[in-house]
């Protein structure tokens, strides 16, 4: 029994402290994540634009009228989510901001934030670090915002996020906070 226990501890140490073991541990974690799965909440909606949709809507920039119409439909069909994340960066002011802001104010919208200047690797931002500008009408209409910075691991997979960056929670946490208000 002692030999089996010792062998198990040595194997665990190898998985934790060696590069090869770390790679095996990551694969185990990835596989367990797939097997366990994830059940999305039906009252949380994430709006993102895929390539097919981008082309169907005429390419970039996509008119903000489309997003306002989507929000109007969600309200008309009694399908208003408890959190609506717009995974889109709005970095300039356009005349369609006001109609979009009106629809946003009727829903629990969360906007993403990115740093205006990239940070050197491993450097933590300071409080008040400059975030990329968002049109004021949209900023006021949103119920929350969160950063969308991620760090890919050496194998190209994201296995975690920084829960807080300067004064911003991560986008997913901001959506959860808005959902539970």
Identify the residue ranges that each predicted region occupies.
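Non-transmembrane functional regions of envelope-associated proteins
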Residues: 1-181
């Amino acid at each position: 029994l002692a030999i089996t226990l010792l062998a198990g501890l040595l194997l665990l140490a190898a998985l934790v402290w060696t590069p090869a073991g770390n790679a095996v541990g990551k694969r185990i974690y990835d596989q367990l994540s797939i097997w366990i799965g994830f059940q999305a909440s039906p009252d949380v909606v994430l709006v993102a634009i895929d390539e097919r949709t981008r082309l169907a809507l005429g390419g970039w920039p996509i008119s903000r009228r489309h997003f306002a119409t989507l929000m109007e439909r969600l309200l008309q069909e009694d399908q208003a989510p408890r959190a609506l994340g717009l995974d889109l960066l709005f970095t300039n002011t356009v005349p369609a901001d006001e109609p979009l802001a009106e629809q946003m104010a009727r829903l629990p919208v969360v906007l993403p934030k990115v740093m205006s200047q990239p940070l050197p690797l491993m450097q933590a931002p300071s409080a008040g670090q400059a975030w990329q500008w968002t049109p004021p009408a949209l900023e006021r209409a949103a119920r929350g915002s969160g950063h969308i910075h991620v760090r890919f691991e050496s194998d190209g997979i994201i296995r975690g996020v920084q829960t807080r960056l300067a004064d911003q929670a991560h986008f997913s946490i901001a959506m959860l906070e808005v959902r539970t208000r």
